[in-house]
């Protein structure tokens, strides 16, 4: 295609529209050195950009937890209640965080799926054996579950199974919840694509009933420690909810 000039104060991003995954020649100019040179770039899609932003966000949270806890706690974010997220969490807590004293489980902004039973089992381990080889302790058992303390973060943007999973976590007394209340949206939804494939209907078809006859749907889940992230702190890159979760879990561990 023909070359396009970029003028002062012009938003050049629109020149990269519809060029994702297409090698694009860019000419750059440094007004101070008066040097001009060319680079070949590979534009990415909005979806890829969002994935990179998400990965950066998770790495920032993990680094903060590591710093605030002096390396005592690990951090995992459950992006969605599905298999890929579970595998990531499983790998992290039993891999790089295996020797940590506790785990901060972040479910904020999770749109749901079905993972409440898996998370319940994974984080409710209780040590019953220690493997010893020639006098050296090798590992605790169960070795495929988390046997140490944890705490869970939730927020107003949690939806569906991201309401149900924190509810199960609290109901089974695995740990405490930190953050903001979650609307009662724990249902099973049937997703139906219409003749026009751009139209998709999600119809709640299954409710989750407690022994007293009430349903999780429309039952707001309150955190044990209520704390909001204000816009004033978010724009500074500060995560008040996360810092509170770290402080609360460390206090719990130090009591033992």
Go through each PLM region and give its residues.
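Glycine-rich active-site/cofactor-binding loop and its immediate structural neighborhood
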Residues: 1
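Metal-dependent DNA phosphodiester-chemistry modules and their immediately adjacent helices/loops
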Residues: 63, 158-160, 195-226
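Short acidic (Asp/Glu) and glycine-rich catalytic loops that position anionic groups and cofactors
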Residues: 97-101, 221-228
